[in-house]
């Protein structure tokens, strides 16, 4: 992560002189961005899975949601960093050098992340599946206490005889549910809105600077992610996703309405903030919670990787198609996202199992039972 961030910041330091716009420089720049993308992809899959495997079941959802909070907090920091760079540089310097400072800032958290990983233990479920029971018990004891650690280790061993099993051992449904959770999280359009938030705010107005309004939205995102953290273990995963989907649909349809009837000022800005806020209290953190929880132990690694791969594929599709859709018709773009939000609510209601209060071994038994009944 550190090398990819540093390389993205200034690849021409390694190969070229400043200002060189050669094809080779473009290749070098994109090479380092790809390395960074691989790092982000790995982290996005492994982090929630790791938290779910090591956390006590009664606070697992809250802790996995904290992962999303950290991401949103990082995005808010980026908003502030970019705003300060934009505000503190002359335009001619901003165009040539502003992006270098933005990419360079990645190196600091990336280096800290890499260093701190040396202090993190392996998950007890992985250790148990690889027959390292003493190490698994040691980790469980530190997290849960001695008596509970014995019970949890016994449950893990009871449902796990092998390190891995074939992907479809528990049927196709669990894989489809995981994939569709990822697809809907992206297809509802949130990342397109976040990527292009400054330009959207500048275009629709609202009486202020587009970048500053983006910072305000970042603060809202953090506050509503906290709502998810403090309600996920009380309300459950499914109710939050359904409420969030409906709230997002309302926000998206309101933006479409404002554009269709030329309603300017603060209302369209508030509608986008409502749309983002409901995402942050639902699909933002809770999708990751469910992806980390629903899969049986022995296929979790492969299944999470597939689900996250679909997430990044649809992230790319949505973010790359949004500018053209928005230019063609904002009404169409936000209307489409609103419809997808409604479909997402129906999908969660009909197909997604509730994982609140269940151990990961309970989910293994659930899918094992469903596979036998199918």
Question: Each PLM stretch: what is its role?
Answer:
Residues 1-135, 139-141, 158-374:
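Alpha-helical transmembrane bundle of multi-pass membrane proteins
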Residues 143-145:
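Short helix/loop segments within enzyme catalytic domains
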Residues 149-158:
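Short, well-structured alpha-helical segments
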